[in-house]
Amino acid sequence: EVTVQGVGGHGALPHMAADPIVAASGLVLALQSIIARNVDPLDPAVITVGSFQSGALATIIPGEARLNIGVRTCTRGTRELIRKRIETLVSMQAKAFGCEAEIIYNPGISYPPGYNTPEHAKLVHDVAVELGQDPARVEMRGPFMFSEDFAFIQEVVPSCYFGLGNGKSRSLHDSGYDFNDELLVKGPVFWGR
């Protein structure tokens, strides 16, 4: 979580404030430069700003802005590089607009990438095809970037992470998601194979 602390004020007097929204907005854009210019393009990494909160009124410059940032990498080295670059950009972006910033890390949400072993992925693929699934929809090559507890198991036990899908409805993280009750029958059949 990043908090950009500015100086609030009236929207008609921006020269008497330090606008944290402007500083944080610039930061959102600058964060993408880390992936584009600091990370090896052959080393998968993602930075997501999943939440941006600030202010409540159209005519008031708020005193602070908060960003929640998610980082996904496949290597610890890249994760550390991104962490250092985020710290630098947060500090510099805040200072550029007369603000200050604080970063709070939650180390409990740092997950390793997951990897499917070829033999287990083939087993899942074969069962999916046997059950009438589209083979193209069950392929998962390379690491996956989800924050998934199962990745800790995969560090020790060769395995395959997969999803059954939800049919034609919206996907899991969509606000309109509706669980497909047919999965209550399909899931156990799949696992039983």
Please give the residue ranges for each predicted region.
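Fold-level recognition of mixed alpha/beta catalytic cores in primary-metabolism enzymes, strongest
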Residues: 1-29, 33, 42
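Metal-dependent amide/peptide-bond hydrolase catalytic core
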Residues: 25-193
